[in-house]
């Protein structure tokens, strides 16, 4: 029951964030919109920011749950950027309310997991070679997250598919061919 209530609150908050900035949404707005009491909200979350964090954690679980292979890495990466595009208002609103660092943490987690699964599934490494692979994962994590944050900052001027196509061209010529 608690998970159902949390999902209703999350869905309602996303809907409200289509129309208002997070800073202008009150607990009262949220609870009235989804028909639950303020106490029900506070039984599940400390505040609206706690709910936002829960939403990202839940959505991250869904994205991270995918198995990444050499054959489907483009689809896995696309799902991260498609999530951002599909949740545009929520993501932009979060970006404006929490700042770049919050989304950077979320994206770093997703992209690092994605790259680690991709690379370590394809190769077996030890010692110095493992350190180089870990460095490469960090390097590409920061590159992809930087591109993603820039895309968000510019209010997503291209589609997720167009962005992925550009990323694929770069990655196919470098990280994938190196391992």
Where are these regions (language model features)?
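Alpha-helical bundle regulatory/interaction domains
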Residues: 1-20, 24-27, 33-179
């Amino acid at each position: 029951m608690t998970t159902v209530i949390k999902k209703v609150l999350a869905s309602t908050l996303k809907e409200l964030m289509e129309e208002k900035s997070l800073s202008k949404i009150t607990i009262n707005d949220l609870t009235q919109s989804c028909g639950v009491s303020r106490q029900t909200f506070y039984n599940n979350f400390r505040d609206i920011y706690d709910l936002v964090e829960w939403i990202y954690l839940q959505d991250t679980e869904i994205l991270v749950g995918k198995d990444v292979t050499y054959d489907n890495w483009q689809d896995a990466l696309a799902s991260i950027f498609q999530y951002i595009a599909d949740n545009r208002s929520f993501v932009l609103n979060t970006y404006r309310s929490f700042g770049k660092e919050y989304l950077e943490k979320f994206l770093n987690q997703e992209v690092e997991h994605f790259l680690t699964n991709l690379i370590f599934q394809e190769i077996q490494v030890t010692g110095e070679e493992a350190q180089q692979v870990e460095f490469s994962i960090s390097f590409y994590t920061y590159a992809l997250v930087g591109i993603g944050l820039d895309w968000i900052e510019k209010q997503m001027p291209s589609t997720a598919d167009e962005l992925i196509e550009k990323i694929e061209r770069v990655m196919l010529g470098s990280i994938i061919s190196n391992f």
